[in-house]
């Protein structure tokens, strides 16, 4: 094999022999990114960023453009696949202590924030009823910022309400941000290769490493093939599974939907926002639900890196997973009992996981040192 630096980046990269299937999601995310950029380009060619024509242009893409329905569905459902993969990728990082590779973790969370911003801007583009109202509610949170809030919101909207300038700038941002994601992904991979991947046992992998290609690259192909198969099955047979019925109607600023909610991948943060009966408090909790991930490298106190041999941390981790799913479910429901109470309890449990990491680590160290 020729010793070229690009081949060294991927092919000759030494990787621990014992990394499991949970390490496959990085390559799956890269595949999702390529798919989103390609389908997004073909959609942008036919899309019109104008409030009178945006909805009609989506209908035109779906009905008249050859394979337009496939591009549109692949792009929409591909975004959901992207978020499924990234949430599993982050969960694996939390479970196996990958966050101790600080630079890689920080670049990864920055990637998540950029991806969420890109997805939000993209959700507005079809100019459906739910697109319009979700954008109104989420961007309106900026008004909670003391002193600067109203000016910031007006600046973002390009006027005193969401209108044509808002759609134009959201389209521009949705087009440019994927290139920032590509740059950040490259940085993420470079930083990862600087220190090397962790492994399920949390041991020093230097004693037992093999080349990434052909061993791990072929292992990655299995889940990659399953993901693509799953994606095409949904696109072909259940294309509207993640869509909101309200979004099949053109945006009408005079009619408010009965229940405003963003796409499912934002619902955990939206559920935390709704659980606090105060605008500024809710906005801060929403930001904190993502930003708290930045703290994990600094709150790790356990002697062992992964949770593989730490039962207390495992219990809290699986509580976090079930909490995440419960908040997402509760956020799809109306703001009424018992869903308000469920959202509040699960929001508290969500933050408890991150606050309990140092205490549990200290307790586990004590338990292990006890003869």
Swiss-Prot record:
Pfam families: Cytochrom_B_C, Cytochrome_B. One of its GO terms (biological process) is mitochondrial electron transport, ubiquinol to cytochrome c. One of its GO terms (cellular component) is respiratory chain complex III. CDD domains: cytochrome_b_C, Cytochrome_b_N. GO terms for molecular function: metal ion binding; ubiquinol-cytochrome-c reductase activity. InterPro entries: Cyt_b/b6_C, Cyt_b/b6_C_sf, Cyt_b/b6_N, Cytb/b6-like_sf, Cytochrome_b, Cytochrome_b_C_euk/bac, Cytochrome_b_N_euk/bac, Di-haem_cyt_TM. The chain crosses the membrane at residues 25-45, 69-90, 105-125, 170-190, 218-238, 280-300, 312-332, 339-358. Component of the ubiquinol-cytochrome c reductase complex (complex III or cytochrome b-c1 complex) that is part of the mitochondrial respiratory chain. The b-c1 complex mediates electron transfer from ubiquinol to cytochrome c. Contributes to the generation of a proton gradient across the mitochondrial membrane that is then used for ATP synthesis. Belongs to the cytochrome b family. This is Cytochrome b. The lineage of its organism: Eukaryota, Metazoa, Chordata, Craniata, Vertebrata.
């Amino acid at each position: 094999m020729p010793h070229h630096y690009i081949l060294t980046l991927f092919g000759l990269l030494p990787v621990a022999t014992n990394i499991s299937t949970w390490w496959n999601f990085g390559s799956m995310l890269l595949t999702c990114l390529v798919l989103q950029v390609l389908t997004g380009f073909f959609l942008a060619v036919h899309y019109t960023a104008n409030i009178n024509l945006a909805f009609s242009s989506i209908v035109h893409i779906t009905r008249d453009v050859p394979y337009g329905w496939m591009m549109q569905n692949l792009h929409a459902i591909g975004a959901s696949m992207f978020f499924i993969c990234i949430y599993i990728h982050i969960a694996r990082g939390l479970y196996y202590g990958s966050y101790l590779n600080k630079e890689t973790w920080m670049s990864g969370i920055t990637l998540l924030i950029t991806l969420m911003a890109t997805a939000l801007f993209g959700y507005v583009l079809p100019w459906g009823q739910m697109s319009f109202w979700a954008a109104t509610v989420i961007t309106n949170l900026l008004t909670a910022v003391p002193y600067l809030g109203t000016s910031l919101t007006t600046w973002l909207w390009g006027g005193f309400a969401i209108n044509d300038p808002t759609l134009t700038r959201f389209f521009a941002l949705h087009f440019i941000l994927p290139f920032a994601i590509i740059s950040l992904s490259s940085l993420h991979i470079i930083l990862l290769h600087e220190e090397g991947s962790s492994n399920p046992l949390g041991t020093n992998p230097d004693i037992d490493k093999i080349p990434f290609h052909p061993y791990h690259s072929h292992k990655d192909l299995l889940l990659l093939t399953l993901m693509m198969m799953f994606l095409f099955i949904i696109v072909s047979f259940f294309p509207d599974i993640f869509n909101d019925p309200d979004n099949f109607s053109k945006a009408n600023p005079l009619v408010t939907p009965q229940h405003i909610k963003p796409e499912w991948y934002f619902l955990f943060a939206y559920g935390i926002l709704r659980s606090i009966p105060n605008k500024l408090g809710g906005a801060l909790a929403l930001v904190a639900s993502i930003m708290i991930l930045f703290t994990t490298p600094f709150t790790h106190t356990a002697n062992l890196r992964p949770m593989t041999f730490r039962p207390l941390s495992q219990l809290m981790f699986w509580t976090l997973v079930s909490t995440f799913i419960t908040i997402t479910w509760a956020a799809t429901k109306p703001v009424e009992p018992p869903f308000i109470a469920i959202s509040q309890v699960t929001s508290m449990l969500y933050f408890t996981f991150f606050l309990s990491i140092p205490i549990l680590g200290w307790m586990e160290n004590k338990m292990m040192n006890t003869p």
